[in-house]
Amino acid sequence: MRGGRVLAFLHAALALGLAAAAAGTAAPGAALPPADEKGLTDLQLLGKRVFEDANLSEPRGLSCASCHAPEHAFQGNNGSPIPGIAAGSSPDKVGRRKVPTIMYKTYSPAFGLTKDVDDGKETAEAKGGQFWDGRASDLVEQAASPLLDPVEMNNPSIEVVVEKVKAGAYADLVTAVFGKAVFADPKTAMNDLSSALFAYEATERFAPFSSKFDDYLRGKATLTPEEARGFEVFTNPKQGNCIACHVGEVKSKDPTDWIFTDFTYDALGVPRNPAIPANADPATFDLGLCKRPGIAAFLPKDVKLESLCGQFKVPTLRNVAVAGAYYHNAYFTSLRDAVAFYATRDTDPQRWYPKLKTGEADKFNDLSGALKDNVNTEEVPYDRRPGQKPRFSDADIDALVAFLKTLTDKGMK
């Protein structure tokens, strides 16, 4: 793929204004574009057309926007009965992971893996990429994946996708942006369409920084006492310690320094979600990072692949209050429960996990055998044991939820 070259070109073009003329400029007497298309370049407008095209699935009827609904912070489930887990283009197909927001995704670096040493033990730290398991290095590479996924848009090949675009309503826009020969080579055409999607997803609507917290940083809003307490719990390394992974520059008033993720991966031992059809097979486990295609090529010497099993990418917390479901498997449908799980996973595991015949909690039940040892149990707030006091209280949980609600961008619901 030409993803790296396309990304470099796009970043330069978007920054310098060298992309095609803005689509919001209409000729005298011509119909004005919809309000949400004003100011878009032709490249960005093409990306929007692809994003909203429900003819690109097999069978037709499913678009990117079907699962990534703009009003829900570009996430959703396409009418699935399982919160956060999307139905595919075929009515009998349902995914196994929560649909992630694609807002603020352009801030994620390309996927990489570095060697680390933790208490004398060699480990590997993954960072960046797209999807819960990082299987796409960047957004250009990511764009084609749902189109070909049999559980999502279900196209059998790139050639089929490109032929649909060629026969579609905006084929003239494709040739205007990329030239008349664009459809000659399907792989090149697919990469060009992916770059258009990237250009659209790099627009301000995907990273508006319009939340109350952003206004607070700018000095235009004040946090309530409860929200301020929640922010303290969030940043306190001896309480929530959320900022350890959902990072922000504490001294910065620039919203772009607060993406609320370090783009790394972690194993949290989230309870198994019985609502996911694939989980009906007790021998089936979603192992995340260690099953990323091509992961072995990134793996440092002397680091075992199995050590990455159970890890999933740390998501941004921006717009988390409108997510509707939480964690990679959408097990939690309440933001308060998702936060309480952090606080009490290890002090009261029976609250979250099913019981074994012994009466004990089947802790980390979405991992098998020795892979349960991969779960993060040392970092605050997970460094507690049954009977110990949680790192933060019920009142702190309420305050933290109140703070997280300040991260919702305007217009999201």
Which residue ranges define each predicted feature?
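Bacterial N-terminal signal peptides
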Residues: 8-20
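Periplasmic c-type cytochrome electron-transfer domains
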Residues: 2-5, 24-413
